[in-house]
């Protein structure tokens, strides 16, 4: 499944039945790419789980992040314009990527709920959770729970 001519590198990972890897993909040690999952032009750190029915394109998934069943990273805007990373917090800062294809960046230990869509240019900082069926955009600060666009709450300390 990993072809050097395609600039792919897979190190001690688990590529399951019917997974599809294309473009330049780096998949870290102990990661799982599951059934009916497509990986395209990604950097996937160690022990990441993309276990079933996912699409991850032009994205970076941090250490021990997990994409729930059916969750995807959308990597192209519907109007085909260049992707801009927009900070959804008070600053409203915008970073122009200069790219038409730019998916999402997930920090370490991010959990994405089933059937969620991470829109182009989404950044989810470390230790965050995304509720199932969410449509996420912008920057989600570290240690937060994304319930919906109007309800992004800090995690309670244990």
Task: List the model feature ranges, each with a label.
Residues 35-158:
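Glycine-rich hexapeptide-repeat left-handed beta-helix
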Residues 8, 16-19, 24-26:
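Right-handed parallel beta-helix
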Residues 28-34:
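Surface-exposed extracellular loop regions of Gram-negative outer-membrane beta-barrel proteins
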Residues 1-11:
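Single conserved hydrophobic/aromatic residue that forms the stacking wall/gate
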